[in-house]
A protein has these predicted regions:
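N-terminal small-domain helix-loop-helix segment of the aminotransferase-like
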Residues: 2-82, 86, 361-366
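PLP-dependent aminotransferase-like
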Residues: 6, 90-150
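A short helix->loop->beta-strand "cap" motif at the edges of active sites that frequently abuts
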Residues: 96, 117, 175-179, 203
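Helix C-cap/helix->beta junction micro-motif
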Residues: 115, 175-176, 286, 320, ...
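Active-site phosphate-binding strand-loop segment of PLP-dependent enzymes
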Residues: 126-193
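Conserved core segment of the aminotransferase class I/II
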Residues: 201-273, 280, 352, 363
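Conserved glycine-rich beta-strand-loop-beta hairpin in the small C-terminal domain of fold type I
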Residues: 255, 271-280, 290-303
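PLP-dependent enzyme catalytic core of the Aspartate aminotransferase-like
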Residues: 315-324, 330-366
Length: 366
């Protein structure tokens, strides 16, 4: 097992759990919870025990079928957060060089700090729509790079990396002997656009994902890792340190959810399509924000043209009962993240209050 640093904490997750709640929550990035009553679940379908030593086989079969891979390439985890922790713990040793995008999801950096990795960064620039720039990416790779980390869709901007670009990034990483870990949890929201997991693009790809963000099934905690069988065996050994056995009722619920995923997907698609119109109309009305229209995902990441967001976010929550994620958690203090994946009335009301707060906001003079 790799050595771990005991003082690494995720300031973002602490904030999200303790300070993000508000009457109008635009901080969340996962689709509104799917009602359990709308799944054909009966109490007699559930059991306390019955899981296998390394995955409940009916669930493992569904995960493998969904991903189009053999079961030997799948690790079951309790959500994407655990998937990322397990994957990174298995892939990275203390002192290994890891190349990761900026901005990125804060807990990924925290895990790397926890492990003691040597972290290098490459920029995904706001003025270029946070697209993955292959030139910048290739320049930052070195002969010592052991792992590259990408989010697709990008968190926080929801920018999509197309298959050609992802394949080229994988080829560049392969030339220096590096693997590529891709967090694909938000890619599940590309309901209308065909896509393949990056796992199918090259032997050096490892992928994490879950049902938590795109489907409103966060409470089931169904996540997974896709990796080559040799890596999968190592990752299961990391899982052994996290629990003796998973929550079997959650595994059974996940099987039921997979068997009715079309129904769950249709509800999520309709919600996001409606809310995306609202957020894009909001962005058009606000030239004081710099942000491309939303095309994918559950979030946008606008930049305040004047002022920093820390004070604005505080005023928004305290005076307008609305929460967004401060850009400081993504190392972008002029930005903030808006989630538009809640109930439509909540999103509409939150955007109205966000408009009012922007009109009232007077950034402090220098």
């Amino acid at each position: 097992m790799n050595g771990l640093q005991s003082d690494a904490i995720s300031h973002y997750l602490t904030w999200a759990k303790l300070h993000s709640n508000a009457r109008f929550n635009l901080a969340a990035s996962g689709v509104l919870d799917y009602p359990l009553a709308e799944l054909p679940v009966h109490i007699e379908d559930l059991e306390i025990g019955g899981t296998g030593p390394y995955g409940y086989q009916p669930l493992m079969e569904r995960l493998a079928t969904k991903a189009g891979v053999p079961k030997e390439c799948v690790v079951y985890t309790l959500g994407t957060s655990m998937a990322n922790f397990v994957a990174l713990t298995a892939l990275v040793h203390r002192g290994d060089e890891v190349l990761i995008e900026r901005p990125t999801y804060d807990p990924l950096l925290t895990i790397l700090d926890h492990i003691g990795a040597k972290v290098r960064r490459f920029e995904r620039l706001a003025e270029k729509g946070f697209k993955l720039g292959l030139g910048e990416f290739e320049r930052k790779l070195t002969a010592q790079t052991r792992l590259v980390i990408l989010c697709n869709l990008h968190n926080p901007s929801s920018t999509f990396i197309d298959e050609s670009t992802m394949r080229q990034a994988g080829d560049m990483a392969s030339k220096v002997g590096a693997r590529v870990l891709v967090d694909e949890v938000y890619l599940e929201t590309l309901f209308e656009q065909p896509w393949r997991s990056a796992f199918h693009l090259g032997a050096n790809f490892v992928v994490t994902s879950s049902l938590t963000k795109a489907y409103g099934l966060s409470g089931i905690r169904c996540g997974w890792i896709l990796a080559e069988p040799e890596l999968v065996r190592r990752m299961w050994q990391v899982v052994d340190f996290t629990y003796g056995s998973p929550v079997h009722p959650a595994e059974l619920l996940a099987v039921i959810a997979f068997d009715h995923l079309d129904r769950v997907r249709d509800r999520a698609r309709a919600l996001l399509e409606t809310n995306r119109v609202l957020v894009n109309e909001f962005l058009v009305r606000h030239p004081d924000l710099d942000c491309d229209p939303s095309r994918f995902g559950t979030t946008v990441f606008p930049r305040l043209r004047v002022g920093h967001t820390a004070e604005f976010v505080r005023i928004l929550r305290e005076q307008f009962e609305t929460s967004v994620v401060p850009g400081e958690f993504f190392e972008q203090p002029r930005h903030f993240r808006i989630g538009f994946c809640g109930a439509t009335e909540t999103v509409r009301g939150g955007l109205e209050r966000l408009s009012a707060a922007l009109e009232a906001f007077q950034p402090p003079s220098r």
